[in-house]
């Protein structure tokens, strides 16, 4: 396999990994709508982008530390946190992916891999009193490639940087 093919495979991997966080933002906003159909749609996305045993942590000044395991555990945390609020919009900014390993088959398709990703988030939350609560944070993810599922997040840490309302 040529070095060009290897670099192409790495570029595709980076793009696929970045899209995990973008899909997460969409799923989280759906769950925040708090109706059964939207929560189920968000849950389906979470099951696609997270491995079955993903570990989740939220930390940072002014934030209650939270932990959960697995996509369904995280749906419960998100639904409880966002249900009292109005609509939300999670905007994903700067994304940096580092491919730690990427093993390709003879056709140039991945069959295993490890990566890390850092992503900025601005999350806007409508409050019941017409105010908007702004959460600024950084996601730190550990990601693996699974032949049956593709790239999935195995560990997610959300660290709050700042916020206001």
List the predicted regions and their residue ranges.
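Short, low-complexity N-terminal intrinsically disordered segments enriched in polar/charged residues
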Residues: 1-48
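A beta-strand edge to alpha-helix "cap/lid" segment located at domain peripheries
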Residues: 3-7, 83-165
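Active-site micro-motifs of SAM-dependent methyltransferase domains
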Residues: 26, 56, 158
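A generic structural signal for short coil/turn motifs at secondary-structure boundaries
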Residues: 35, 65, 126-130
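A solvent-exposed, acidic/Ser-Thr-rich amphipathic alpha-helical stretch
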Residues: 40-120
């Amino acid at each position: 396999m040529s070095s060009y093919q290897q670099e192409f495979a790495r570029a595709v991997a980076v793009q696929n990994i970045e899209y995990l966080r973008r899909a997460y933002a969409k799923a989280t906003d759906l769950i925040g709508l708090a109706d059964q159909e939207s929560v189920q749609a968000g849950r389906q996305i979470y099951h696609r982008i997270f491995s079955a045993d993903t570990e989740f942590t939220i930390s940072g000044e002014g934030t209650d530390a939270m932990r959960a395991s697995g996509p369904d555990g995280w749906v419960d945390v998100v639904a409880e946190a966002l249900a009292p609020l109005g609509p939300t919009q999670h905007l994903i900014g700067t994304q940096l992916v580092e491919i730690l390993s990427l093993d390709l088959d003879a056709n140039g398709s991945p069959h295993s891999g490890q990566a890390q990703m850092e992503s900025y988030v601005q999350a806007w939350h409508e409050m019941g009193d017409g105010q908007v609560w702004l959460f600024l944070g950084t996601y730190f993810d550990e990601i693996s490639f699974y032949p049956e599922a593709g790239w999935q997040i195995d560990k997610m840490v959300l660290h709050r940087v700042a916020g206001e309302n």
